């Protein structure tokens, strides 16, 4: 198991008691690894895919607990050399799905709208945690430190940089083919867990 997967598994165990923080984390997860599903009569749904089973379970719990969805779940073997499993959750197109996307500040046409759930520092931490869980990687602190998050949305990448700057994290952004990469090489730790007894720190996040 890679160091990144170890960190993601640890983050996926963190319990968030505040719904606003759960929603902020879910929003970033969907923006990072989600896509729209179209239906008839202007109905919309969504699809979320990840290679981490703990992250998939976390998204499933959030969708069921906070928004009343019962997503279908699929597991398939990846096509790459290691053939890692890919876990996919699907919320079928419906009026409820469209209402959910509007509530989350996600516009099916524009792709990314201004985030309505980033008022407190805890919500911002949860948002960054979601972005990392959805599309981040990190090297071991003992080696040359490097944290990066990859997205296909320029606006989302810019928002990640802005949110990281709130915590005085000097993140930078670059583009690679069709992706935008937010990265940081200088070590800095920001607590992302609300649990006082168990507060794992991700260097740079």
Language model region names:
Residues 50, 56-57, 61-81, 88-205:
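DNA-contacting interfaces and partner/effector-binding or oligomerization modules
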Residues 1-44, 51-55, 73-84, 125-128, ...:
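Sequence-level preference for short, compositionally simple segments enriched
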